[in-house]
Amino acid sequence: MSTAVINTDDDQLEPTLQSILDQKSLRWIFVGGKGGVGKTTTSCSLAIQLAKVRRSVLLISTDPAHNLSDAFSQKFGKEARLINGFENLSAMEIDPNGSIQELMGQAEEGEGPAAGMGGMMQDLAFAIPGIDEAMSFAEVLKQVKSLSYETIIFDTAPTGHTLRFLQFPTVLEKALAKVSQLSTQFGPMLNGLLGANGSLPNGQNLGEMMEKLEGLRETISEVNGQFKDENLTTFVCVCIPEFLSLYETERMIQELSSYHIDTHCIVVNQLLFPKKGSDCDQCNARRKMQKKYLEQIEELYDEFNVVKMPLLVEEVRGKERLEKFSEMLITPYVPPAGGL
């Protein structure tokens, strides 16, 4: 395992993700950034490197686009599956908007005039923004906790959705309060509609519904506490050297800071390194622009490990190319002579 450093300044941190590999206590690692900056490639590559130094690693995609299957050329689903060619690296792709019916084990609605009451209660109880996503995320955490992986990496959705999970305990508490309020308000009416076993016409038991919600809320609250422990959790920001991406990265880092979530690594993808004497005007102009934003990144985040990754000629897909790309997260890329 290399710890090579190309920067010799004493005050400059190593431009690699080696610190993440060395921090054995880390259990949760999030990889996030603006859409199209290489989050999935980075998260897959980091997972490959971690698998070399950890007992077991799980890579989870919470991005609706689900690019893990494309990256590894292997189909993944909502159950953890071993990645071909690895003995201790698994992956899964989850739907962040799983249906309430599926999450609550909802039975099919019956027939008759009262058949719609269960559905109405459900619609009223779950008419809370984000409840589907919150419950889906809580179910995943519940499953992940029982699987006892040493390290879990999240390939997150684009920036706007990345930190939504931090609000999920509040969302689930609102849903619990709503169900409780409805059961009180409609108590007399429900008494005439409840089945012999105390269930609604569609088979859903209110007590079981509240118990399920409470269990999910406890799970997500417990794990959120771990997310705020820098010994257990870190967030890797991925960007490209352009204005909008830099702006999104700064906004994300500020938000992470407000939630007390550790972040000390930034991966800058798609860097151009024109050869000395290159007559490609577009390449040189773009490199000049990239250099400006790269200098801003290094100035703004002088206390971060800033990893510089080159724009490659070939698409990074498949185990072999991902492994090759992952090496540059640990051993800094050295541009050809004359490349700046």
Swiss-Prot record:
GO CC term, one of those recorded: GET complex
InterPro entries on file: Anion-transp_ATPase-like_dom, ATPase_ArsA/GET3, ATPase_ArsA/GET3_euk, P-loop_NTPase
Alphabetized Gene3D superfamilies for the sequence: P-loop containing nucleotide triphosphate hydrolases (3.40.50.300)
Localization, UniProt: Cytoplasm; Endoplasmic reticulum
Gene Ontology terms, MF aspect: ATP binding; ATP hydrolysis activity; guanyl-nucleotide exchange factor activity; identical protein binding; metal ion binding; protein folding chaperone; unfolded protein binding
Record keywords, A-Z: ATP-binding, Cytoplasm, Endoplasmic reticulum, Hydrolase, Metal-binding, Nucleotide-binding, Transport, Zinc
Positions bound to Zn(2+): C280, C283
One example of a Gene Ontology biological process annotation: cellular response to oxidative stress
Chief location of this protein within or outside the cell: cytoplasm
Active site: residue positions: D63
EC numbers, comma separated: 3.6.-.-
Keyword Lipid metabolism: no
EC class: hydrolase
Annotated Pfam families: ArsA_ATPase (PF02374)
Record field: transmembrane: none
Cited function: ATPase required for the post-translational delivery of tail-anchored (TA) proteins to the endoplasmic reticulum. Recognizes and selectively binds the transmembrane domain of TA proteins in the cytosol. This complex then targets to the endoplasmic reticulum by membrane-bound receptors, where the tail-anchored protein is released for insertion. This process is regulated by ATP binding and hydrolysis. ATP binding drives the homodimer towards the closed dimer state, facilitating recognition of newly synthesized TA membrane proteins. ATP hydrolysis is required for insertion.
NCBIfam families, alphabetized: GET3_arsA_TRC40
PANTHER family according to UniProt: ARSENICAL PUMP-DRIVING ATPASE ARSENITE-TRANSLOCATING ATPASE, ATPASE GET3
Assembly mode: Homodimer.
Similarity comment: family membership: Belongs to the arsA ATPase family.
Name of the featured protein: ATPase get3
Organism listed in the record: Sclerotinia sclerotiorum (strain ATCC 18683 / 1980 / Ss-1)
